[in-house]
Structure formats: C-alpha cells, structure tokens
Amino acid sequence: MKKILFAFSAATLIMVSCQTAPEADKATATEQQETTNATGDNYTIDAAGSTIGWVGTKTGGQHNGTFLLSDGTFTLADGNLAGGSFNIDVSSLAVNDLTGDDKAKLEGHLKSGDFFQVDSFPTAKFEITSVVPFDAATNTSKLEGATHTISGNLTLRGETKNVTFPAIVKVEGTSVSAVADFNIDRTNWGLSYKGPNNPADWFIAKEVNLKLDVKAAKSTM
C-alpha cells in the first residue's frame, strides 16, 4: 500500500511539474467590487485592433489562442486612465497553434459546456474598479515597464471576481492603450473539465495566462 501511495504521489508531482503556466504576474482574485462612474473624456475601444491572448497548459504541452473584443470604452480624467469597461466575445475563441480538424476539435471542446459554455455565456466583461500608478519601490512585476496597477471585475461564465494586475498604460494624443500579461486561476470562474474533482481536470493547469492588448481612440461625439 505504501508503495502504491508513493507511486501515486510521485506521479502527481510529475503532472504538476509539467503543467506550469507561462511565467507572468499572478493576478490576485477577490470578491466583486463596486464600480464607480468615472467622469472625463471617453475613448472608444478599437475592437478590431485589440486582442486578448491566452495560453492553456496541460501535461505534456500547451495551447495558445485569442479572444476578440466586442466593444467598450475607456474614460480618461486629466489625461489619466480612470475607468471603463469592455466586452469580450467568448464565441470568437480561436486556437492558434493547431490547424485543420485538430484546431476545430479543440475550439469546439473549449466552447462547449466542458469549459466556456458559449451557448449560454457568449460574452465576458471586464469593468475597471481602480487604476493607480505602479510603485516600483514597493511592488515587483514580471511585466517590464509596468506603469499602473489595474483592478476590475471580470465576469466569465456567469461568475464575477475582482482581479488586480500590473499594466502598461500609454496615452498618446487621441489614443490610449493598455497592455498586461498575467495568470489567473480558471477555477475561480468555474472553469473545470467535468468538475473540479474529476481526475480528467488534474492534467490541466489551473493557471491560465492572459495577454491583454487593448486600444482605444477618443470618441468624437
């Protein structure tokens, strides 16, 4: 019996070691926070020019892809990002490292009730609740050149959690951009294969890497 338990423990350690998400800041997740209506100049999200990249890790490898944005707005007060929100088209989920039938099969699998259940939850949303300057003296970040720390409510598959992560925010003329690279624990939003306690889910890393590249232009109206 001891040999069996030892073998199981060793196998578990091997599985975990092969499921490491890309090195990035780990976004802290807390309960949903109240949003405030920021006042200032509105900037319309450039859905065509913005992307959210993702990397999922499993035993033996990784897959990567993208989500597209539907719409959204950033609000700037005195030239600084103060608030905003954007909608994510979850049904746009694409797998970029596969082609042909393998690509279609994995995309269908991820969009099904096994994970994102896009037929019931086709849209995710991120609402900014706080933006503060990044203090390199008291904080560290794997994102080189981080300028701000952003917090916001992320609603995914009907679950809302507040996440905090470093970002690079740039305001240039009539445009603004926000770039971030961080990992989240997918189980906080109920994303698990056949349930969190199913052995099939153990082969998939809980942490998913997200790469945000969101652009917006000053609204003309």
Regions found by a protein language model. Name each.
Residues 1-16:
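Sec-dependent bacterial lipoprotein signal peptides
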